[in-house]
């Protein structure tokens, strides 16, 4: 699917075995900002965490390498020591996990600020069950996305 391809194509440009947040910006009337990082401790092809502003919509998504056979899923987001329960959607034929869009999605992203790692726990007993990502510096790195997607009160 489109988002899965966006995430994996951006990660192909990553140099070396690094995990810092990678940012791509496309300026214009409706600017696009894409931020990605690969799952830690997985062999390639790794699942990818992606924050994006596309068509003025903020999204937090995870591109999976093994499809899930469900339409939506309860997840626990562990940001360092803070646990946040949420309900995510499964899109693109089971290959993409997606948080809520819009304001509730933005609030979910803001709760990750200050954390060094994010673990997305779907409770599934498989490779996609617990995915950990390096989100160190997210609050700083996400600044161009906040601008592009006009986060309220910024």
Predicted regions and their residues:
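A generic "folded-domain core" signal
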Residues: 1-154
